[in-house]
Amino acid sequence: MLTDDPGSTEPLVVTHDGPIATLWLNRPEKRNAVTKAMWEGIAAICAEFATDRTVRVLVVRGAGDHFCAGADIGELEVSDSSYAAANAGADTALGSFPKPTIAFVRGSCVGGGTQIAIACDVRVADTSAVFGITPARLGIVYPAFGVDRAVRLLGPSATKHLLFSAELIGWERALRIGLVDEVHEPAAADERIDAFATLLATQRSLLTQESSKAMVDECVRTGEISRATQARWGAELAASTDAAEGVAAFLERRPPRFTWAGTSD
């Protein structure tokens, strides 16, 4: 199911470029449609990399010309509670991943593909990208956690429009409603995703990234940031040398060398 071989035919492939891990959905002949086993694999990969201090950024992308055309329809015909559990597990693992996650979208990003993209922190697309949430075409109920994430990202009106109509939208509208954060021409998109991931992984404080992600997510969920969360990250800051290093690097006009690598708990 999982391999580090970039030439593999396995449906999930992980490649590494220093501190950047890339998770490839690798069924290009099926537009990277996701099977139950792939949902389970995504959860397992996220669990492994969440505590791997050599991994600073996770990029999710599709092999070939498409990101992900959604769930494998053949499996939906015989899906049961275990399929729903696998889907929920992947969504939770990706959405709660403590380090920055980037979805790199080209071509189809539909149904479960949109669910994966929304679970990531940042979505970068090229101009071939097409998005949709399409359960209304199939007569199925979209997962509640997927609806919840979509509403929090897009707002209720845009989410209802996508769910009610099952229409596919291009990058222009996706950018307008906040479904993607950046769009680039195909020739420039790969270079941009590499540069952005490298920036996050090598020149920015992981302490700032993880604390910001935790506080933003908590604020979205509950409407506030608890004192316990504030105290936790205050303690991490006090125990870290990153703040002193950041100030010194700024004054000395050099790139910072941040050393914080993960929470102490």
Give the positions of each predicted feature.
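Terminal low-complexity tails and localization/encapsulation signals of metabolic enzymes
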Residues: 1-9, 248-265
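CoA-thioester-processing core
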Residues: 90, 94-96, 104, 110-163, ...
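A general structural signal for well-ordered alpha-helical segments in protein cores
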Residues: 73, 87, 147, 156-159, ...
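C-terminal long alpha-helix characteristic of the crotonase
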Residues: 124-129, 180-228, 241, 257-265
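Glycine- (often His-adjacent) and acidic-residue-rich active-site loop
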Residues: 54, 62-96, 109, 139
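Well-ordered beta-strand positions
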Residues: 122, 161, 165-167, 173, ...
